[in-house]
Amino acid sequence: MRGVFFVAVAVAIFARSSAEAKLLSEAAPGLAADAVISGESRERFLRVADSEDDDLAAPADDGKTEERAPKFKSLSEINKKLDEEVMVHVSKILGNMGAIHADNIAKARAALEAAHKSGDITDKQLAAGLAKLV
């Protein structure tokens, strides 16, 4: 294993000093072109500049494809909209509270009766527990 390591190090040293190393270190023209963002599309670097790739090409800039202004003009409008959405969510939760409460009481009653049936609690404890559930 050491011999293979030393051979690999020697090949790397010779490759670095040879003229072929310059060719290996240069990027392929296609890769370099993909990495460079043209000056006109710096704001919109996600748009494709290559005309060969029609699937990802951006539509022609006819003035209709410009980015639209946001719907909200201030933070107070955004906060108001978020508050409205939160209140709708809270009202849905509060609307379901009766069903949630009834379900929890039924589960607690079943647990108390199961504990009484198995002898873990007395009749008096069962009555006190059921009275607290009301």
Curated annotation (Swiss-Prot):
For the keyword Secreted, the answer is yes
Which superkingdom? Eukaryota
Question: What is said about the domains?
Answer: The RxLR-dEER motif acts to carry the protein into the host cell cytoplasm through binding to cell surface phosphatidylinositol-3-phosphate.
Q: Which family does it belong to?
A: Belongs to the RxLR effector family.
Which purpose does this protein serve, as stated in its record? Effector that, due to the lack of a histidine residue at position 79, is not able to induce cell death in tomato, tobacco, eggplant, potato, or in A.thaliana.
User: What further note is attached to this protein's record?
Assistant: Avh238 is highly polymorphic among P.sojae isolates.
- Name this polypeptide is given: RxLR effector protein Avh238
Q: Which organism is it from?
A: Phytophthora sojae (Soybean stem and root rot agent)
